[in-house]
Design a protein with these regions (language model features):
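An N-terminal hydrophobic leader/cap segment in hydrolases
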Residues: 1-28
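Conserved alpha/beta-hydrolase
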Residues: 57, 64-86
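Alpha/beta-hydrolase active-site loop
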Residues: 89-110
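Gly/Ala-rich beta-loop-alpha elbow adjacent to hydrolase catalytic centers
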Residues: 113-122
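Hydrolase active-site cap/lid region
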Residues: 127-175
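Short beta-strand/loop motif that positions the catalytic acidic residue
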Residues: 188-190, 195-197, 201
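Short alpha-helix in the alpha/beta-hydrolase fold that links the catalytic acid
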Residues: 191, 205-214
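Catalytic histidine-centered segment of alpha/beta-hydrolase-like enzymes
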Residues: 227-237
Length: 257
């Protein structure tokens, strides 16, 4: 059970992802003794792409070409324990710290596009020093306690075991669960945000994004159907919405909030 929370599956890149990664400028940083792999594309204000659990940065490659065409540069990272980055254990805090380290290395980061657990990691980073003009959150949990309790239920833990598991999780991450729940995460939501979620997502319920939208005054929520949790990342309309939202001359989506 602890492994299910802390050790992601390291999935291989597809052939198209290998080709995509080969076209970027690859570099790495040291984050808490682990090698953080990242790739840079384009020239302009930096957009950081953050992937989800047991995934890799190249799974968001569909956003890169349109962002470059819109005048941005793109930083694609593999979170600790994922893809080409080293490390066995990981969490949203590991990923959030990696984002902070990369942002510090790159200088100003204009925006973030984050999927699933990467969204939670981005929300935590935004509360802990990451400053952006805009961020896009795709199918992400907005409260970590909900995720941990769902894992406990899936493993049929009783109340005592669940409490012990929560204590272990907090010790592993080095922060309290309350600090990764929406009331705390909302403190970092001073900028404009776009929230995208599919109603047929069977991994993260759309209620998580609705709650995030409710707590974020400067956000827009767009709900889709039929895309699920992962296919949404390659949907042309979703990609277009995210890229248009990032463009500083296009306030259409923001004004709908």
């Amino acid at each position: 059970m602890c492994q299910a929370f802390a050790v992601p599956e390291r999935i291989a890149a597809t052939w198209s992802e290998v080709s995509f990664l080969g076209k970027g400028w690859q570099a790495s940083l040291d984050v808490d003794g682990n090698r953080l792999a990242f790739w840079m594309y384009g020239c302009g204000p930096v957009i950081l792409l953050m992937h989800g659990w047991s995934s890799r940065g190249s799974r968001l490659m569909g956003f890169v070409k349109p962002l470059i065409a819109a005048g941005f540069s793109v930083a694609v990272l593999d979170a600790p324990g994922h893809g080409h980055s080293s490390g066995a254990g990981s969490s949203v805090i590991h990923a959030g710290k990696a984002a902070l380290k990369l942002a510090g290395h790159l200088g100003d980061v204009y925006g973030v596009i984050a999927h699933s657990a990467g969204s939670t990691a981005a929300l935590w980073a935004l509360c802990n020093g990451l400053s952006v003009q805009r961020s896009v959150h795709v199918c992400g949990p907005s409260s970590m306690t909900t995720v941990v309790l769902e894992i406990a239920r899936a493993h049929c833990l009783n109340d005592r075991q669940t409490a012990e598991f929560c204590v272990w999780v907090e010790a592993f991450m080095g922060v309290t669960l309350a600090s990764i729940d929406l009331p705390a995460l909302a403190m970092g939501l001073k900028h404009s945000g776009l929230i995208l979620h599919d109603g047929d997502d069977r991994v993260v319920p759309v209620a998580q994004s609705r709650a995030l939208h409710g707590a974020w005054r400067r956000s827009t929520l767009i709900e889709t159907r039929g895309l699920g949790h992962r296919r949404i990342l390659s949907d042309p309309h979703i990609i277009e919405c995210a890229v248009r939202f990032m463009m500083p001359t296009d306030h259409q989506l923001e004004m709908q909030a």
